């Protein structure tokens, strides 16, 4: 059976945008994130805020090529960019003093991807 990729038009647009920016700025991180978002939904990343709290440092930029979920607590001030956020995850990130932004907003702020970590 032929692999078709994601059918969500917004996700397809984001993947094209990531590839374009990867070529434009000559950085591989955005191409890697695009590849991870292209995977089937059942293989896409689902990260709880407790995992972000465990592995991220204060002030760090984290990109999640999938969903951020609200299980656990977050005590660090981090910038998290993801495809989707649950309501509780977004609330917990903001309450901890961090930011919950889209992947496009992260690329606008940091087009070269320096200091950005991918978390799955």
From Swiss-Prot:
Gene Ontology MF: a single term: structural constituent of ribosome
UniProtKB keywords: Ribonucleoprotein, Ribosomal protein
Keyword Ribosomal protein among record annotations: yes
Ribosomal protein recorded as keyword: yes
Example GO BP: translation
Matching InterPro entries: Ribosomal_eL18, Ribosomal_eL18/eL18-A/B/_CS, Ribosomal_eL18_arc, Ribosomal_uL15/eL18, Ribosomal_uL15/eL18_sf
Entry-linked Pfam families: Ribosomal_L18
Gene3D superfamilies in the cross-refs: 3.100.10.10
GO cellular component: cytosolic large ribosomal subunit
UniProt similarity note: Belongs to the eukaryotic ribosomal protein eL18 family.
Complexes and interactors: Part of the 50S ribosomal subunit.
UniProt xrefs under PANTHER family: 60S RIBOSOMAL PROTEIN L18 (PTHR10934), LARGE RIBOSOMAL SUBUNIT PROTEIN EL18 (PTHR10934:SF2)
Protein name: Large ribosomal subunit protein eL18
Organism the protein comes from: Pyrococcus furiosus (strain ATCC 43587 / DSM 3638 / JCM 8422 / Vc1)
Gene: rpl18e
């Amino acid at each position: 059976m032929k692999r078709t990729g994601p059918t969500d038009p917004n996700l397809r647009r984001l993947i094209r945008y990531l590839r374009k920016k990867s070529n434009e700025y000559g950085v591989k991180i955005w191409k890697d994130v695009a590849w991870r978002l292209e995977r089937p939904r059942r293989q896409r990343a689902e990260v709880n805020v407790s995992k972000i709290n465990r592995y991220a440092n204060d002030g760090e930029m984290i990109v999640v090529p999938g969903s951020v979920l609200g299980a656990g607590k977050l005590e660090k001030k981090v910038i998290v960019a993801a495809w989707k956020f649950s309501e509780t995850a977004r609330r917990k990130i903001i309450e901890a003093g961090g930011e919950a932004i889209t992947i496009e907003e992260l690329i606008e702020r940091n087009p070269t991807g320096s200091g950005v970590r991918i978390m799955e």
